[in-house]
């Protein structure tokens, strides 16, 4: 398995990395960073028709958290964005940890992740992978 795209953002407090690879038609993504990269959460996101009936893709996600870990917000954010953009099943795992983070540092981490997510979506398209026809 080759990582289709892998990116890194330097932060004022540390760094964040994210990447994605294909497993058949599905996507495996990861997040890591901070002082103690780890696996704190795994999210599986599955595309489905939006309940609005307007033909857009929505997502249903299942979450596995390690006790005491708060990595769901980041892993879920990346998994659901990739799932919506590609119409593919996405599993994202990883963790980001810095002791005693300040609110502005949390905001910086979220913005970095959003930038990495955009890079991954572009990288998937640039590698020639088009969104799946979901058949909804």
Regions found by a protein language model. Give the residues of each.
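Conserved mixed alpha/beta catalytic, RNA-binding, or beta-rich assembly cores of soluble enzyme
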Residues: 7-85, 89-98, 103-131
